[in-house]
Every structure is written in structure tokens, then in C-alpha cells.
Amino acid sequence: MKITGQEVTIVMIEDDEGHARLIEKNIRRAGVNNEIKAFADGTSALDYLLGADGSGLVSAHRQLLVLLDLNLPDMTGIDVLSKIKGNTHLKRSPVVVLTTTDDSREIQHCYDLGANVYITKPVNYDSFANAIRQLGLFFSVMQVPEAN
């Protein structure tokens, strides 16, 4: 995935190592070779996205796509999503929510906050693998908007 010649960095925020490996494997299988920055908690991901000063200026010229689990060990994915979409420098970055939560109110809340896609991770491994393969296909046709 490129934007005007600039590579898009995929930021994966997923605390389950097995899920993270499966997601990356299927993204690669779909032919997407972009850099993947993996984080197992919201704090380290936000440090990367917002920078030490928390302003987000560090991401002003980055082309990012965020894969976000809602169930993180240190904060909720909703908190992470709110900070991303509430930041001037990050708000146009696409966010794909990938989580086991299928509560319709929580799904709507994610969309209300600015999530671009919400994918429910099945608990069953084969179903989960299939959902991630579909995510890989999604990546193969997706374009990321340019940063301002």
C-alpha cells in the first residue's frame, strides 16, 4: 500500500501474540509487504503514534493504518481510538477495529468515534483465520487517504 509514493506503515495494537502472528501472516499472504509496527498494549502504541510530547506531531507526515484490538491489558481500545481520532495529526488515519466483542452498542460507539471498519474476531481458530484472510483481501484493494 502506497500513497503518492510513500509507504503506509501498519500499526497493529494486539495483546494476543498468537492473534498478532496470524494477522501478520495473512496480511503478508495477501501480498502486502508494508512495515508492521506491533504493540501489545495501548500505552506503547500511543507513545509511538503521539510522540513523547503527546501532540501527535511526530505522525504528521506518516502514512498510517491502525489495526486495533479493543481488549488491551492497560486501557481499552476505545480509549486508543478516541485519542487517535481526536488528534489533528492522526484523525485521517484509517482504523480497523479487530476484536472479539460483538456488542452492537460497542460497535456503533466505535463507528461514532471514527473507526473505519469493525471486524469481529471469532473465538474459533478456523473462523478467526478466515476473518483475517478476508482482512488481507481488504488490504489488497484499500487506499489510505493522504495526510494533511
Residues of each region from the PLM?
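Non-catalytic signal-transmission and effector/linker regions of two-component phosphorelay proteins
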Residues: 1-11, 17-37, 41-46, 50, ...
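Conserved phosphotransfer cores of two-component systems
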Residues: 56-61, 85-92, 113
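Active-site residues of response regulator receiver
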Residues: 68-69, 99
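The feature encodes the CheY-like receiver
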Residues: 73, 103
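A short, hydrophobic beta-strand element within the central beta-sheet of small alpha/beta folds
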Residues: 92-102
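Short, glycine/charged-rich "phosphate-handling" switch motifs in NTP-dependent
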Residues: 116
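A Lys-centered signature of the CheY-like receiver
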Residues: 121
